[in-house]
Regions:
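Topology signature of small-to-medium multi-pass alpha-helical membrane proteins
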Residues: 2-159
Length: 159
């Protein structure tokens, strides 16, 4: 088997696994777009008012939050979605898999979900409410809770 071989690809995929993959992909696509817009703006203009920066500690511009959004939640979620769906074997993540007893994408899903809940909580404390907070906060919580269900956990558990 190669490093990109997949585990038991023909095994029945529960609906909850499809749902987790869809939620990760949705978060990933939204975060790539949002992160890009925070870093580069839309038409050269920032998508968020600079006065919001006054309430956010440790940052002077939207680049750092944009990079976290783009790379961490954007690309990270898309890679995790691929991992949940295909379960590729990547040798460099073998230690994590031995530690958890699950495919690396299970751990990534929980970390991304918990990170998203934390991110939205910090947003709620720092900037005015947005409907996106009401969408992506519960999405993060759903990722954590779904990853812990027997159907998802069992599907991603190493045999």
């Amino acid at each position: 088997m190669t490093l990109t071989a997949t585990r038991t690809a023909r095994q029945h995929r529960p609906f909850t696994v499809t749902l987790v993959t869809t939620l990760l992909a949705t978060l990933g696509i939204g975060a790539v777009g949002g992160g890009w817009a925070m870093i580069f703006g839309i038409g050269g203009e920032s998508m968020l008012p600079d006065e919001y920066l006054e309430t956010i500690p440790l940052v002077d511009n939207w680049v750092v939050p944009g990079v976290v959004l783009l790379i961490g939640f954007g690309f990270g979620s898309l890679i995790a979605a691929y991992g949940v769906w295909r379960r590729p074997i990547w040798a460099w993540l073998g230690g994590l898999e031995r530690l958890t007893g699950h495919h690396w994408s299970w751990t990534a899903t929980i970390l991304i979900g918990a990170g998203q809940v934390t991110w939205i909580t910090l947003e709620l404390l720092s900037i005015p409410f947005s409907v996106l907070m009401a969408i992506f906060g519960p999405l993060g919580l759903a990722l954590v809770l779904l990853a812990l269900t027997p159907s998802v956990s069992g599907y991603i558990r190493l045999k």
